[in-house]
Amino acid sequence: MWGLLTVPAPAQARRADSSEFDPDRGWRLHPQVAVRPEPFGALLYHFGTRKLSFLKNRTILAVVQTLADYPDIRSACRGAGVDDCDQDPYLHALSVLAGSNMLVPRQTT
């Protein structure tokens, strides 16, 4: 019974990993993710995990498509026209994408 209530060691290690979602750092699409724009937003497909995600509007699509152009996620949101006070739902959506490996931290050089 105790094993059902504890977090397995690999998940704990993953949480302490440097890839933990931080909107103040640079992120990018995983190289195995394809983006297909749609009238409602977009479909994201990860060829490595075979996971499909939906972006529900064009604004979040603009943020995802321009992540490489900005030093951090907050700046990408601003660039897509999302004011700082309105960023919470976008940051949550992006954290979910990072948690599912659709987004990965950008390497610093």
UniProtKB/Swiss-Prot annotation:
Lineage: Bacteria, Bacillati, Actinomycetota, Actinomycetes, Mycobacteriales
Record's function text: Peptide chaperone involved in the biosynthesis of the enzyme cofactor mycofactocin (MFT). Binds MftA and MftC with high affinity, and is essential for MftC activity on MftA, likely via the formation of a ternary complex.
Domain of life according to the entry: Bacteria
InterPro entries: MftB (IPR023850)
Family classification: Belongs to the peptide chaperone MftB family.
Name of this protein: Peptide chaperone MftB
